[in-house]
Amino acid sequence: MPDASDADLLDGQALSQAVRDEVKADIQAWTDDHRPPFLSAVLVGDNPASKAYVRGKEKDAAEVGIETETHHLDADTSQSELLDLVHDLNADASVDGILVQLPLPDHVDERTVIDAVDPSKDVDGFHPENLGRLMRGTPRYIPATPYGIMEMLSRSDIDPESMDAVIVGRSNIVGKPLANLLLRRTANATVTVCHSRTKDLAAHTRRADLLVAAAGQAAFIDADMVKEDAVVIDVGINRVDDPSTDRGYRLVGDVDFEGVRPKARRITPVPGGVGLMTRAMLLKNTLKAARLRATSA
């Protein structure tokens, strides 16, 4: 656990544990009258990061009382075979949530697969219907990483109202949905989304009261790009070579943590920050899926 010297850290370990404890209590109450929530994960290939992430999700689910199954398919599985599995899971009344682990192999079109998932079982929140609901302000499932960031801010008493929020990265998984959440009347931030074609990126990041780095580039945001006393959220998780470690690499974020930390009011570490909150919010979405399916049955 962080000590007093880590007061600036947004501790994903402690915050995600609090979420898991709440979900566990909710599931214990739910299962008095219902079966446990059931999550089916689909993993294609042997990407080490994807395999580790799925194992982490399985561990989290077991901790809170969610039952899981993982369909691990060969890397050369055809798109049609993958779609057949997704359709089978859609039709299976015992499955509450479906998670297709990304990225998929190059020969599979991710958008086609995501669109094939039953939106009522799309606990990742990536289906166009669920993204549209989010944009309209009536979300069913919020994508887990933006959801986790908002939960982290809330539980850390960081109110984004009137903040200049700058998001570096415009993906459908993080940047765009997070911008939408920060623009809602419950958040009231002023939002700028930057990307690879943004002119003078540092001019934007230097004015950010809330800076979210989701560019997928190791240590991309340095101290010169950060405003004094900013809140810095690092979504990135990148492997960099490090012969001094047993694994030969270490994990770093999109932010130069050691350089930026002295300037930041609050900052997330990598690992131990946003990634843990992402996993925790997936559990909340899965429980919600079980509740929605029970009420619609």
Swiss-Prot record:
GO terms for biological process: L-histidine biosynthetic process; methionine biosynthetic process; purine nucleotide biosynthetic process; tetrahydrofolate interconversion. GO terms for cellular component: cytosol. It catalyses: (6R)-5,10-methylene-5,6,7,8-tetrahydrofolate + NADP(+) = (6R)-5,10-methenyltetrahydrofolate + NADPH; (6R)-5,10-methenyltetrahydrofolate + H2O = (6R)-10-formyltetrahydrofolate + H(+). GO terms for molecular function: methenyltetrahydrofolate cyclohydrolase activity; methylenetetrahydrofolate dehydrogenase (NADP+) activity. Keywords: Amino-acid biosynthesis, Histidine biosynthesis, Hydrolase, Methionine biosynthesis, Multifunctional enzyme, NADP, One-carbon metabolism, Oxidoreductase, Purine biosynthesis. Catalyzes the oxidation of 5,10-methylenetetrahydrofolate to 5,10-methenyltetrahydrofolate and then the hydrolysis of 5,10-methenyltetrahydrofolate to 10-formyltetrahydrofolate. This is Bifunctional protein FolD. The gene is folD.
